[in-house]
C-alpha cells in the first residue's frame, strides 16, 4: 500500500476584503499517494493559487486539516512551516525564480544552504547530480542570462529535486515557454513521475 503524502480534510480559506468575506476554498478534501501525478485545473479565480499556496505551506487554511507526509501543518508557526517546506517540498514556478548572477550549480544548491548537516562538497555533488538528471551536465557554470527559457526551467526543476522532496509542486511550469520547450518539460516531468516522484 502506498503512503499518503498529502491529505486535506475539509480545508477552508477565507479572506477579508473590506466588509466582504471571500471564500477562496470551500471544504476541499482529497489525498495524494506517493508516486501519483496530479493536475489541478480550474478557471481563473477558482482558488488554484490559494490551494497551491496551502499545499506549499506558504499559507495556512482558515479551518480544516492538512497533513504533509504525515505532519499536521495548520497549527505550525511560519518558521516551522518554512523548515517543513524546505525539507518536504520542491517548487517549480512559471517564472523560474533563479538568482540571475549565480551559476546553475549555485542556484540548485540554494535549498541546501539552510541545512547545516550537508557539507559544501556534498551540496555541490548533489547539485551536479540533479542538473545531470535534467539534462544540463554541460551547463553547470552557466548563469541564467546565458540559458534559454527551457534550460532555466530545467535548472528550477533540478533545484526542486535537490532535497529529495516528498512532493514536487509545479505552478504553471510551462506557462512562459514555447510549445516545443513546453513539451520537453512535460516529458521531463513524466520521466520524474516514472522514477516514482510525486508531482
Residue ranges and their predicted role:
Residues 3-199:
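ABC family nucleotide-binding domain
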Amino acid at each position: 500500500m502506498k503512503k499518503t503524502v498529502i491529505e486535506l480534510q475539509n480545508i477552508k480559506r477565507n479572506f477579508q476584503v473590506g466588509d466582504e468575506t471571500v471564500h477562496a476554498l470551500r471544504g476541499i478534501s482529497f489525498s495524494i499517494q506517493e508516486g501519483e501525478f496530479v493536475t489541478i485545473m480550474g478557471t481563473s479565480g477558482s482558488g488554484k493559487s490559494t490551494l497551491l499556496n496551502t499545499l506549499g505551506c506558504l499559507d495556512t487554511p482558515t479551518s480544516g486539516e492538512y497533513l504533509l507526509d504525515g505532519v499536521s501543518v495548520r497549527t505550525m508557526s511560519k518558521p516551522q512551516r518554512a523548515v517543513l517546506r524546505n525539507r518536504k517540498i520542491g517548487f517549480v514556478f512559471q517564472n523560474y525564480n533563479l538568482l540571475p548572477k549565480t551559476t546553475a550549480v549555485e542556484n540548485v544548491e540554494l535549498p541546501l544552504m539552510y541545512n547545516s548537516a550537508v557539507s559544501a562538497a556534498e551540496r555541490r555533488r548533489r547539485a551536479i547530480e540533479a542538473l545531470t538528471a535534467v539534462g544540463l551536465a554541460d551547463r553547470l557554470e552557466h548563469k541564467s542570462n546565458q540559458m534559454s527559457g527551457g534550460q532555466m526551467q530545467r535548472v528550477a526543476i533540478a533545484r526542486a529535486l535537490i532535497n529529495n522532496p516528498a512532493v514536487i509542486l509545479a505552478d504553471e511550469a510551462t506557462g512562459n515557454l514555447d510549445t516545443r520547450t513546453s513539451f520537453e518539460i512535460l516529458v521531463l516531468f513524466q520521466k520524474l513521475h516514472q522514477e516514482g516522484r510525486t508531482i
